[in-house]
Amino acid sequence: QFIMIRKMQLADTHLSLILMQAFTAFGVFLMRQSYLSIPNELSEAARIDGLSEFGIYSRIMLPLSKSAIATLIIFSFVNVWNDYMGPMIYLNSTELKTIQLGLRMFITQYSADYNLIMAAALISLIPVGALFLSMQRFFIEGVATSGLKG
């Protein structure tokens, strides 16, 4: 992966971290299961009504899979946010280092400033909590509409 990132000239960029976590097997299987749970009758009815395949995807499949997309966004963000080895390998510039590498800078060979580590860890939870709270309504919609039939 590192050689591929270097050949695309994305080494030492945040985009390299995002691309390495954007298309994971978890995301593929989560979205597959989400699309398989949507009844075929909906897409067949849309085809009969004259809707194109893109229209079926954009007007039926995508809105019904909002909860799965929100889940995928949250899990991907948390995975990238908590990644330690990826930034350690792909980022060389000090100003591009992530907060996880910054937490490691509080630990020296002989001591660790635990009060600063805990304060920084608490601050690093704020974006994850904000993302979860902003995506929470999609979970509620998914649970509310999952029991509806036809």
Annotate each predicted stretch with a short phrase.
Residues 1-150:
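A structural signal for multi-pass alpha-helical bundles of membrane permease subunits
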